[in-house]
Design a protein with these regions (language model features):
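Rossmann-fold NAD(P)H-dependent dehydrogenase/reductase core
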Residues: 1-211, 289-296
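Short, contiguous pre-domain boundary segments
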Residues: 1-5, 261-272
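Alpha-helical packing segments of well-folded alpha/beta enzyme cores
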Residues: 55, 175, 234-237, 282, ...
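Polar helix-capping/helix-linker motif
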Residues: 72, 151, 243-244, 275
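A short C-terminal helix-loop "cap" of Rossmann-like NAD(P)-dependent dehydrogenase/epimerase domains
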Residues: 155, 211-222
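C-terminal helical subdomain
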Residues: 168, 218-267, 276-280
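C-terminal amphipathic/interface module of NAD(P)-dependent oxidoreductases
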Residues: 270-296
Length: 296
């Protein structure tokens, strides 16, 4: 009989330094809490440092809080400049789902800038300091995505919140594919994996301020609270990547139907998310946009 996975599988992580982006709520908070409990030194990379300090005190253990706004490339560079010691594990967890099309201070479509281009630049800048593992939180939303390499910022095609989110997560999947390919080709000791946390109720953003949208949001929340993973369950696929001897480049999701909830398990991805030519083009695009290079 196979016992269900639990965070106790992490063992003793004392001496390990881990960066978790988006650590103040949702999956990032659940991830940080479990890692700190296992003895790791967790750096909470967050937009709101006041809330970050509050979360750090709640989490206990060995933690530090640092400012990071992934929608601002100057903030990404400033954060990377603060990291002067080796990092064992980098967890690119933070993400955005916006109500309308807006742009970052760098002129990127907000969803793409936060979910792909910020983490991409951060990883490139920190790569010389990473010793062991990079985990990128993707999503099964990639299964419904259309990839427009020539219009990833949705300047010419119609923008929709779910379309932009799905495309950004497909882009993360492709980046992860190419990152894994390069690390293995170089014989690097660093491994990388992708995860899908399931449907986590606390990560759902507001759907707008209109009465109709508020009503829709309440309906979604009511269903989500019944069907979704909680934040600890949502963190499990990420933690599973750390505790289990899974192959480099794996995609870890959840056991339940439709990828909604359940325990961590290795899952498949769409053919497009396995397209190495598309992945190489995606990485070249991200390098041009961020002015950083994936040097493996």
């Amino acid at each position: 009989v196979t016992l269900p996975w639990t965070p106790s599988r992490l063992g003793n992580l004392t001496g390990k330094r881990v960066i978790v982006t988006g650590a103040t709520n949702g999956v990032g908070l659940g991830t940080s809490r479990a890692l700190a409990k296992a003895g790791a030194h967790v750096i909470l990379a967050v937009r709101n440092t006041e809330l970050g300090e509050q979360r750090a005190s709640e989490i206990g253990g060995s933690t530090a809080v640092a400012k990071l706004d992934l929608a601002d490339q100057s903030s990404v560079r400033a954060f990377a400049g603060l990291i002067d010691e080796p990092v064992d594990i980098l967890i690119n967890n933070a993400g955005a789902l916006t109500d309308r099309r807006t742009e970052t201070v760098d002129g990127f479509e907000m969803t793409l800038g936060t979910n792909l281009l910020g983490p991409f630049a951060l990883t490139n800048l920190l790569l010389p300091k990473v010793r062991s593992q990079i985990i990128n939180v993707g999503s099964d939303a990639h299964r419904s995505a259309t990839l427009r390499i020539d219009d990833l910022h949705s300047r010419r095609h119609k923008w929709t919140r779910l379309g932009a989110y799905a495309q950004s997560k497909l882009a993360v999947m492709l980046w992860g594919l190419e990152l894994d390919r390069r690390l293995r080709a170089a014989g690097s000791p660093i491994v990388t994996q992708l995860t899908h946390p399931g449907w986590v109720a606390s990560n759902l953003s507001n759907l707008g301020d209109s009465p109709l949208m508020s009503l829709a949001h309440k309906g979604v929340k009511m269903v989500a609270d019944r069907l979704a993973n909680d934040i600890d369950e949502g963190a499990a696929p990420t933690l599973y990547c750390i505790s289990e001897p899974i192959p480099p480049g794996s995609y870890v999701g959840v056991t339940g139907r439709f990828g909604l909830r359940g325990g961590p398990v290795l899952i498949g991805r769409t053919p497009l998310a396995c397209d190495y030519d598309a992945a190489a083009r995606l990485v070249a695009f991200a390098e041009r946009e961020t002015g950083t290079t994936l040097e493996v």
